[in-house]
Amino acid sequence: MHIKLANPRGFCAGVDRAIEIVNRALEVFGPPIYVRHEVVHNKFVVDDLRSRGAIFVEELDQVPDNVIVIFSAHGVSQAVRQEAARRGLKVFDATCPLVTKVHMEVARYSREGRECILIGHQGHPEVVGTMGQYDTANGGAIYLVEDEEDVARLQVRNPVSLAFVTQTTLSMDDAARMIDALRARFPGIGGPRRDDICYATQNRQDAVRQLAGECQLVLVVGSSSSSNSNRLRELAESIGVPAYLVDGAQDLRREWFDGIRRVGVTAGASAPEVLVRDVIDRLRQWGVVNVEELTGREENITFSIPKELRVVSSD
């Protein structure tokens, strides 16, 4: 059995930054550090941070006074920010800068009184946070659409003053279809010059396309709560290749590999490389004789952390 590794895979710049913010806060201020929502959607990462003193909560009413709280990489609504400010909580914001970019677009449309349509998955924390950037007090409204049927049913107040944004972790193919449907339904709709899907999501989906073209089965290392990891599995399946989403080596099943000679392995943007290596080690035990790293788009993007956390070790 032969393994091909997708490239790029695993952590993106936004995830690196979010995890570093929690780690640095623990180092500088000591535990407990409160984090609103899982800082990234990966069980291994969250369990590790929890073991070192991070406390994960879903709402600020679970956070006591006079503590440090970190907002997750997915972003939060303006109402959450206002509540934190009202209570005087010390906040470090781990929102991915590419999500913040979408937030700024939505806030601008709101200020202009322009209606906004968000393409995304209902209930996902990024979507909740993005919807919460829109202030209807200026006379506009924001709408969420998940599929083309939603677009067909959507009734807006003012189709000539309308714009769209997208969740950053969507399938590129699905987003393109949705944007086409919106433009067909509302010819005057505005939006970003390109969709808001982030560079890491695009690169990992492109890498999976290559992987699926060369392999008989694809493994995606990532948690079931991770939107971008689920999209990678769905993309491989849409190409006609069986694909499985696994949190780690413990989720592998030997029967998946009966008659399989070429296995593709990738990882979602919130999955650490150590989990990929664990999967490879397990597959070596089951007969893998060769591991090949595919070439792919190089990623050299980094995002800075808050100044207060940029401490230099005294070691």
UniProtKB/Swiss-Prot annotation:
Q: Which is a Pfam family this sequence falls into?
A: LYTB
This entry's Enzyme Commission designation comes to 1.17.7.4
| Residue positions binding (2E)-4-hydroxy-3-methylbut-2-enyl diphosphate | 41, 74, 124, 168, 226-228, 270
**Keyword flag Chloroplast:** no
Q: So where does [4Fe-4S] cluster get bound? A: 12, 96, 198
Function statement: Catalyzes the conversion of 1-hydroxy-2-methyl-2-(E)-butenyl 4-diphosphate (HMBPP) into a mixture of isopentenyl diphosphate (IPP) and dimethylallyl diphosphate (DMAPP). Acts in the terminal step of the DOXP/MEP pathway for isoprenoid precursor biosynthesis.
Please identify the protein, giving its name as recorded.
4-hydroxy-3-methylbut-2-enyl diphosphate reductase
The source organism is Azotobacter vinelandii (strain DJ / ATCC BAA-1303)
**Lineage of the species this protein comes from:** Bacteria, Pseudomonadati, Pseudomonadota, Gammaproteobacteria, Pseudomonadales
